Regions:
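Substrate-binding/catalytic cleft of secreted carbohydrate-active enzymes
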Residues: 1-76
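Carbohydrate-binding surfaces of carbohydrate-active enzymes
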Residues: 40-55, 74-173
Length: 173
């Protein structure tokens, strides 16, 4: 299993570009190629340290539904079969159990379920991925393959026509 925070652990700066991970060539994945690939701590929010100039609502926008859809597609294609999102359920840190560097009393992180129990848009994207896995159980037993050979095929120019109320217009590409 793996932990993965691909765009940043906190939302204090610009998001990192989401990479196509190529998990199938990662040494740890190669060593366990007949085992399920599980992201045990998958990014659901971003860290808000004490005294930061941003809060959980900024982190909610930082780690949004668009991120989840793209990240899920990349991981599904790479053979990841299970995700555990951290943290999917925001909460409150009571009783001085946290340290100042670990966050405010809020332990929300912009999670899919907010500290005040509201559903955020990204929860739908996570559920979509879960339903996708349920609909296609074959994903859990598929073997990876090498990248296909790309061929550059060129042909004649393409001509398209656009019909408008004023007549027919020709566009060449």
């Amino acid at each position: 299993s793996y932990d993965d925070y691909p765009i940043r652990f906190d939302c204090s700066a610009t998001r990192h570009k989401l990479q196509d991970h190529n998990w199938h060539i990662d040494p740890a994945f190669r060593a366990a190629h007949h085992s399920p690939h599980f992201i045990a701590e998958a990014q659901d929010g971003a860290f808000t340290p004490w005294g930061a100039s941003f809060n959980a609502s900024a982190c909610e926008k930082f780690v949004d539904a668009n991120f989840y859809r793209q990240w899920a597609a990349l991981n599904n294609g790479a053979g990841v079969t299970a995700f555990n999102y951290y943290m999917i359920f925001g909460g409150t840190n009571w009783g001085w159990t946290g340290s100042a560097h670990s966050g405010f009393t809020s332990y929300d992180y912009g999670a899919s379920l907010s500290e005040d129990r509201n559903l955020r848009d990204k929860l739908s994207a996570q559920k979509e991925n879960g339903y996708f896995h349920r609909a296609f159980p074959q994903l859990t037993v598929m073997d990876g393959t090498t990248d296909p050979t790309v061929r550059d095929v060129r042909g004649a120019a393409v001509k398209s026509y656009l019909r408008k109320a004023a007549g027919l217009h020709s566009l060449s590409m």
